[in-house]
Amino acid sequence: MATTGDDTLTITASDYIQHHLTNAKMCSTDGGIAFNYACQDAGFWTWHIDSLLFSVGLGVLFLWLFYKVGQKATIGVPGKLQCFVEMCVEGVDKIVKDSFHGKNAVIAPLGLTIFVWVFLMNLMDLIPVDFVPEAAKRLLGVPYLKIVPTTDLNVTLGLALSVFVLIVFYSIKVKGFSGFTKELTMQPFNHWALIPINFVLETVTLIAKPISLSLRLFGNLYAGELIFILIALMPWWAQFALSVPWAIFHILVIVLQAFIFMMLTIVYLSMAHEDH
């Protein structure tokens, strides 16, 4: 059993878990704009405003931070923040040079943006599960708030679909529309009679890229968040004994998932630039 902040209302463990895994919603109804409970039957046209707020906010923070560091960069002894930024930039640049075999000045900045942005969104998972939602409830009257954008499939799928659009765009740009069509219809079996089979296989392969990207990131972060929530349901001594080791291990997951998303994006775009 779990209790609310004022200890006057007891809720079940399933209620507690469901509450922490529910997004703050906004939707349009006949009466105007509605929020949360009123959006239960709104269907597809429901905005997860907490995911939007934190993902956009962290993106702006990333841009502002790197811009400020770039302005104050010195050729002398760099500070800790400048060292971190330089390490990120040089590391991603090296990965792009090793993995991307085409010529495109966009890929390295794109890879850096994806890595840092996804990392920052993942990093929100280390904030205690009750801290921000409880503060928002008490100060703003917000009943639901999920602060980890990458535990929302809408966010991870949106990122992956953006990568998918770039894959198709550069495939057509480099190979031409006829070359892209030929790639979908004449591989892996180079015979006109097998064009339908080739088209099905290649289309499934192409569509599987954004789906696998989004589900991998979402699944790992959602599972990690769920474990933190389950730990929060335990007695205080068990919370302390389990939350610290899990948080330390989860740091690896946070970094690794950001790296994998970036790395696969670079590889997919490299494949799109290969003109057979």
Curated annotation (Swiss-Prot):
GO molecular-function terms, A-Z: proton-transporting ATP synthase activity, rotational mechanism
N-terminal signal peptide: none
Annotated disulfide bonds: none
Family, similarity comment: Belongs to the ATPase A chain family.
GO cellular component: plasma membrane; proton-transporting ATP synthase complex
SUPFAM superfamilies per the UniProt record, alphabetical: F1F0 ATP synthase subunit A
Pfam families: ATP-synt_A (PF00119)
Protein's job: Key component of the proton channel; it plays a direct role in the translocation of protons across the membrane.
Subunit record text: F-type ATPases have 2 components, CF(1) - the catalytic core - and CF(0) - the membrane proton channel. CF(1) has five subunits: alpha(3), beta(3), gamma(1), delta(1), epsilon(1). CF(0) has three main subunits: a(1), b(2) and c(9-12). The alpha and beta chains form an alternating ring which encloses part of the gamma chain. CF(1) is attached to CF(0) by a central stalk formed by the gamma and epsilon chains, while a peripheral stalk is formed by the delta and b chains.
TM annotation in the entry: 47-67, 107-127, 152-172, 188-208, 226-246, 247-267
InterPro entries: ATP_syn_F0_a_bact/chloroplast (IPR045082), ATP_synth_F0_asu (IPR000568), ATP_synth_F0_asu_AS (IPR023011), F0_ATP_A_sf (IPR035908)
Protein name: ATP synthase subunit a
UniProt entry tagged with the keyword Transmembrane: yes
Membrane association type: Multi-pass membrane protein
Main localization (coarse): membrane
Gene3D superfamilies linked to this entry: ATP synthase, F0 complex, subunit A
BP-aspect Gene Ontology terms: proton motive force-driven plasma membrane ATP synthesis
Protein localization: Cell inner membrane
NCBIfam families xrefs: ATP_synt_6_or_A, PRK05815.1-1
